[in-house]
Design a protein with these regions (language model features):
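Short loop/turn microsegments at loop-to-beta-strand junctions
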Residues: 49, 71, 147-148
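Structural microenvironment flanking redox-active thiols in thiol-disulfide oxidoreductases
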Residues: 84-123, 132-139
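Hydrophobic alpha-helical membrane segments, chiefly transmembrane helices and signal peptide h-regions
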Residues: 9-21, 71, 109, 129-130, ...
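Thiol/disulfide oxidoreductase modules built on the thioredoxin-like
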Residues: 118-125, 131-190
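N-terminal targeting signals for export/organelle localization
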Residues: 1-54, 182-190
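Short active-site neighborhood of thiol/selenol oxidoreductases, capturing the structured segment around
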Residues: 61-84, 90
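Residue-level recognition of short loop/turn positions
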Residues: 57-59, 156
Length: 190
């Protein structure tokens, strides 16, 4: 029974890493966590993560170019059954929220480019970064064994929500709409 204890231990470490990432500049604050969702209030969010890379279809992407937009980042792989199950819900949420200053980005991990492109074709209309080595996932404390995972960045690019499970539109859309409705922090306050 070592394996279940190892999994629980890894999940605890991953959650601690996410909570640490959501704390701000030495403040003694924590984020709210329930049912695999960690949500950080505006005053609890840390500096924006650096998310850059090559798109599956060619060209480059830098999430910093999206400041002013809420960015929903979904980590996925073509080999991941829950990723296949959530694709329609992600696309539905994207279509329902894109006119309110929301954009989506997929990050494909541990995959071949051909398999990733074939998986994405006809499923989602937003771009995906190709990250076969899972560098971006690991930089954001998303171990590949926790895929799928979805991260919602606020309009300043800070991590507002981390979801470590497959998402459904009825759960994700209200979260995205709530973050999109936030007022930007006054200059100099983070």
């Amino acid at each position: 029974m070592v394996a279940p204890r190892l999994v629980v231990g890894l999940l605890a470490v991953a959650l601690a890493a996410v909570l640490t990432g959501c704390t701000g500049g030495g403040r003694e604050s924590t984020c709210d966590s329930a049912n695999g969702i960690v949500e950080c209030g505006p005053e609890q969010r840390s500096d924006p993560p650096k998310i850059t890379g090559e798109l599956l279809t060619g060209g480059s992407y830098d999430v910093a170019d999206q400041r002013g937009q809420v960015v929903v980042v979904n980590f996925w792989g073509s080999w991941c059954a829950p990723c296949r199950a959530e694709a329609d819900d992600l696309e539905g949420t994207y279509q329902a929220t894109k006119d309110s200053g929301v954009t989506f980005l997929g990050i494909n991990v541990q995959d071949s480019r051909d398999k990733a492109i074939a998986f994405e074709e006809g499923r989602v209309s937003y771009p995906s970064i190709f990250d076969p080595g899972s560098r971006l996932a690991l930089d954001m404390d998303i171990p590949p064994n926790t895929i799928p995972a979805t991260v919602v960045l606020d309009r300043e690019g800070r991590i507002a929500v981390v979801i470590r499970a497959a998402v459904r539109q009825e759960g994700l859309q209200p979260i995205v709409e709530r973050i999109a409705a936030e007022s930007p922090a006054p200059s100099g306050q983070r």
